[in-house]
Regions:
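Contiguous beta-strand/loop segments that form the cofactor/metal-binding neighborhood of enzyme cores
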Residues: 170-269, 308-324, 338-342
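Active-site loop of classical SDR/Rossmann-like NAD(P)-dependent oxidoreductases
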Residues: 31-34, 238, 299-311
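Glycine- and charged-residue-rich phosphate/anionic-cofactor binding loop of Rossmann-like
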Residues: 24-26, 299, 317-334
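Core-facing hydrophobic residues within beta-strands of well-ordered domains
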Residues: 23-25, 146, 182
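A contiguous active-site-proximal alpha/beta segment in oxidoreductase catalytic domains
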Residues: 90-93, 98-162, 166-171
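N-terminal Rossmann-like dinucleotide-binding module
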Residues: 1-44
């Protein structure tokens, strides 16, 4: 399901199903005729009855096993997911962000639990094999005690509230993955250096809820012990995007750069040790990889391969009756973190 008139097909997550063993695309839905035609061409659907202008009609007529909610605009994400679950689909693959509010997230979770529908989010960076290597390095004690997980958004024109909602899911998901579920939050949102007030909130782009602030800083107490930090400042001024997160330990640190190759680097010393050089070593899919570079690497193809792993995880979750790695409860947690940031930033009012 896409909405070409309002946000398009996101990061082309529908194409992740093309060529997957055991999966066949049987129908597409869009809200404009050209969108339907383009989607049918992508998925080689030749029967006119396989293209719909009304996604509800598609659910009723086709009764698919899996629905991909691809719209970049999240205004209808919750409605679509609930309707799909109530229609009896076995799985839902959804573009991030998840939904607009914790209330909507709770409703989606309830609907999916009632129908035993599995839902996975397209948080594809979690599925990069390098992330498993990072977990192994932490478990092997290479970082010592993990003290902090520091994350930043892309800090472009979306810096602040929009960055939190649109890019935040990737780094906040990894924060929780490595540091544990959030237990508490402290946050400040400012506009031109002044704390935001309720009057500063405006509707966000692409269906995200009311947002405010050109700069956000937030701290989260994480269940496994470390403190998580998220920050985003509009137009921070760096040509190289700040997007990513750093894991700080007593013996070493790891820096993660989502969407890049190498995706992570290890330094065998804590961040504050400067008495001699400690080089950053690339981390590969099977361990430290000093010679790993991005030469000859198609980043788009790599990212798509991680997305297909997310699809495979959803399929396996359906077949084995388990929760996917970045499933609806992950989406609920991320939505709770976003709402907590603004709730805490307004405490001073």
């Amino acid at each position: 399901i896409g909405t070409s008139s309002n946000g398009g097909w996101g990061h082309n997550i529908d194409e992740l199903f093309i060529g997957v063993s055991g999966i066949r695309t049987v129908a597409v839905a869009d809200d404009i005729n050209t969108g339907v035609a383009d989607a049918m061409k992508r998925h080689r659907l030749t029967q006119a009855t396989r293209g719909f202008l009304d996604w509800r009609q598609m659910l009723a007529n086709i009764k698919p096993d899996i629905v991909a909610i691809c719209s970049r605009n999240i205004q209808q994400h919750a409605e679509m997911a609930i309707a799909a679950a109530e229609a009896g689909v076995r799985g839902i693959f959804m573009e991030k962000p998840f939904v607009q509010s914790v209330t909507q997230a709770d409703a989606v979770v309830a609907a999916c639990e009632t129908s035993n529908t599995k839902l996975n989010l397209a948080l594809v960076n979690r599925y990069c094999p390098t992330m498993a290597t990072v977990s192994e390095l932490i478990a092997d004690g290479k970082l010592g005690t993990l003290l902090e997980v520091r994350a930043r958004g892309k800090e472009d024109v979306r810096g602040g509230g929009e960055d939190l909602w649109v890019l935040g899911p990737h780094v906040l998901d990894l924060m929780v993955h490595f540091g544990g579920a959030p237990q508490w939050c402290s946050a400040t949102a400012t506009t031109k250096g002044k704390p935001v007030t309720p009057d500063d909130f405006i509707a966000g782009a692409e269906g995200i809820p009311m947002i405010a602030g050109d700069s956000i800083t937030a701290s989260f107490g994480l269940a496994d012990g470390p403190t998580g930090f998220f920050a985003s400042t509009r137009e921070a001024g760096l040509k190289q995007p700040n997007f990513g997160l750093t894991l700080l330990g007593t013996k070493g640190e790891i820096h993660i750069r989502p969407d890049y190759i190498p995706q992570a680097y290890f330094r065998a010393a804590p961040a504050w040790r400067m008495n001699r050089p400690y080089p950053w070593t690339p981390i590969g899919d099977e361990g430290l990889a000093p010679d790993l570079t991005d030469q000859g690497v198609d980043r788009s193809a790599k990212r798509a391969s991680w997305g297909r792993l997310a699809v495979a995880d959803l399929i396996d979750a359906i077949q084995t009756d388990r929760e996917p790695e970045t499933g609806m409860f992950t989406g609920l947690t991320l939505t709770e973190m976003n709402e907590a940031v603004y709730a805490l930033s307004l405490i001073h009012i």
